[in-house]
Each structure stands twice: as C-alpha cells, then as structure tokens.
C-alpha cells in the first residue's frame, strides 16, 4: 500500500513545484492530483497482477453490501467533516482566518498520517485473526498498536504544543503566529485520531463496519453543530445572537470534542462487542508527557529558538526525557527498543521492500 502512494505523491509533488516555478496556473495543480491518482492506480494494479479476475456472484455482492455500503456512507460524511471547518470559518469570518487555519492544519496533519499507516498494517491482521477466531490475539494486537503509537505521537504532540510558535516561525512565517493556539488544538486532534484508529480497525476487522460507520456519521453531525455554536459571533438567519465567536479556534475545538467523543464511544463498543478494555499504559504516558511538557515550557520561556536544527534539538531532548522517565517507571523496555530499532533500521526496511517487490505467488 505504501509504495504506490509514495511514488504517486512524489510525482504529484514534483508537478506542484514545476507548476509553481513555471507559472502554469491552478489547472496544473488539479492535473497534478489526477496524474498522482493515476500513477497510484497503475502501481496498485501491478500488485494484483497475479490474481485472476472472476465473475462476481451473489456472495460477493452480499459481502460488499455488508461491508462496503456502511463504509461508503460514512466516507461521504467524513469528507463533509474534513472540509466543514474551513467552510464555516470562510462563511462567518474572512479568507485571512481560513488561511491561518489551513496553514497550521498542514503541520498537524503530518502527525495524523500515522493513522493511515496503522490501518494498512492492522486491518488485514485483525481480519485474519477474527476469521480464525483468535480473540485474545486481537486484544493483544490492539493494545500493542495503541501503546507503540502513543510512544511516538504523545511526545511529538507535547513538543508541538510547547514549541508551537517556534514551529510556525520556522516552517511557515510570522504572519501565521496568530494561529499558534489553533496549532496546539489541532495537534491534540491528530493525537486523538491516531490513538482511536486501532480501536476503529478492531471493530471493522471483526466484521462490524456498521458500528464505526454510524459513529462516524454521528460525530460529523456533532462536529457541525458545535461549529455552529463556537465559530460565528451571530447567525441572524437563525435568530442566534451572542455566540462564542471563536473563529478558527472554535472550529478546532469542535473537531477535538467530536474526536474525543468518538474515542470514548469506540472503546465502549470494543468492550461491548469484542471484550477489549483499555489498558493503563496510555494514562501513564499522558501523565509523563504532561510533566515533560511543563518542564520544557519553562525551558522555552528562557531561551530563543529560531532555527530548524535548534527546534529539532530541543524537541529531541523533550522526547528523550519522556522515554527516560518511562524507562525508570518500567513502561519502556528493551523489547520496545528492539521493536523501534527494527522498524527504523534502513537495512530491515530495504529487506522488507525487496521481499514485497520480488514476492513469489
């Protein structure tokens, strides 16, 4: 899954750069997306080159009816939720506010991309375990996925919150500094989404996409209702006056509240239908991250960071302090270290990619 997306995204990015440098206009930005999707489709098709194409039967259609239709319905609301924040800010505020929000949202989305990686790895594994009725293995897999993802994302989000202004100055510009609080909130949104994904995949991989789809639709509706309350100062058409008028911050809070609601609901549903309970590791990591964040906040008040390598160094120190405290508490073990070492080892990754490309069916 990753390789076609990497190739397609790389080609699309090169076209973006060429279009900007050569002044080709916005039409080439749209063409870049189209070309990228076509490239991804071609490479994805190549992966299925050894699979025969058979005539669909009633069993195939029934499986799509059970799984694909709920997911498709949820996807429609998901797209609406994805763009509703910018739409509401644009309607009730100005293009300037939309630009501030969109700019810092790009940074927060970098954290959220890990959710896609989790789904790509977990969904087939959980589906296979569910088919073989290995419920205990599913429980272990969900807990491990949440724990390992939290080990990476929690300190990353904590450092994003602490150094939000410096991140904006280094990667955007000082014009985006008014959106510092929005970046902090959206970083929390990304964290909640990533930590929710193992639980969502557990339900979908166990043949309950209907539950996650209904939850996605309800959360989209909740998010829109909250935006109507938090974003505008007033909606005279509806007779609503003296609203919160938080603008971009209100949109970010609306998304955060809806994602937290989704997270709580996913865990309740996972317990009810799969008998999977949350573990305490997550709460330990959150407490440690809060302590580290407070300490680094004091450091941030006393020093000036205005270069990218200084920013990476200070954030790295925060991450190292986070892991060190977990190590002292016994929440980070040699097994965890070996797991991350193998995951990040270029030699292991090269071997894995080579096996995928040269696999023998």
Question: What residues fall within each predicted segment?
Answer:
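Hydrophobic alpha-helical transmembrane bundles that constitute the permease/transmembrane domains
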Residues: 5-14, 33-42, 64, 68, ...
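Membrane-proximal transmembrane or re-entrant/amphipathic helices at the cytosolic face
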Residues: 297-361
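Hydrophobic alpha-helical transmembrane segments in multi-pass integral membrane proteins
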Residues: 74-82, 224-231, 290-305, 355-360
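Interhelical loop/hinge segments that connect adjacent transmembrane helices in multipass membrane
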Residues: 3, 26-27, 42-82, 121, ...
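Membrane-interface helix-loop junctions in multi-pass transport and translocation proteins
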Residues: 10-41, 207-210, 217-264, 276, ...
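Specific pore-lining/lateral-gate transmembrane helices of multi-pass inner-membrane transport
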Residues: 100-217
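Membrane-embedded alpha-helical segments of multi-pass transporters/permeases
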Residues: 13, 17-21, 41-46, 87, ...
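Short alpha-helical transmembrane interface motifs in multi-pass membrane proteins
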Residues: 1, 66-73, 104-109, 148-152, ...
């Amino acid at each position: 899954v990753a390789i076609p997306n990497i190739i397609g995204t790389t080609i699309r990015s090169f076209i973006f750069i060429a279009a900007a440098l050569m002044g080709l206009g916005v039409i080439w930005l749209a063409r870049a997306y189209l070309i990228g999707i076509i490239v991804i489709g071609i490479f994805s098709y190549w992966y299925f080159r050894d699979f025969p194409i058979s005539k669909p039967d009633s069993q195939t259609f029934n499986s799509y009816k059970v799984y694909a239709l709920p997911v498709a319905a949820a996807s429609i609301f998901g797209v609406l939720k994805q763009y509703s924040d910018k739409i509401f800010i644009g309607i009730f505020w100005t293009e300037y506010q939309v630009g501030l929000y969109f700019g810092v949202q790009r940074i927060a989305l970098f954290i959220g991309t890990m959710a896609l990686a989790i789904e790509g790895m977990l969904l087939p594994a959980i589906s296979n375990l569910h088919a073989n009725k290995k419920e205990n293995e599913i429980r272990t897999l969900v807990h491990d996925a949440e724990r390992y993802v939290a080990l990476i994302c929690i300190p990353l989000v904590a450092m994003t919150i602490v150094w939000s202004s410096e991140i904006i100055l280094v990667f955007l510009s000082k014009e985006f500094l008014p959106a510092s609080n929005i970046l902090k909130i959206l970083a929390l949104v990304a964290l909640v989404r990533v930590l929710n994904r193992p639980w969502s995949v557990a339900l979908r991989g166990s043949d309950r996409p209907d539950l996650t789809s209904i939850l996605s639709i309800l959360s989209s509706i909740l998010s829109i209702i909250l935006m109507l309350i938090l974003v505008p100062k007033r909606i005279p058409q509806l007779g609503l006056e003296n609203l919160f008028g938080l603008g971009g911050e209100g949109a970010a809070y609306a998304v955060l509240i809806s994602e937290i609601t989704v997270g709580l609901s996913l865990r309740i549903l996972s317990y009810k239908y799969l008998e999977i309970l949350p573990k305490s590791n997550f709460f330990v990591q959150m407490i440690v991250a809060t302590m580290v964040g407070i300490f680094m906040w004091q450091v941030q008040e006393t020093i000036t960071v205005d270069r990218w390598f200084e920013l990476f160094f200070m954030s790295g120190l925060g991450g190292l302090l986070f892991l060190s405290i977990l190590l002292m508490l016994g929440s980070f073990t040699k097994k965890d270290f070996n797991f991350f070492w193998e995951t990040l080892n270029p030699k292991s990754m090269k071997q894995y990619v080579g096996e995928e490309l040269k696999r023998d069916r």
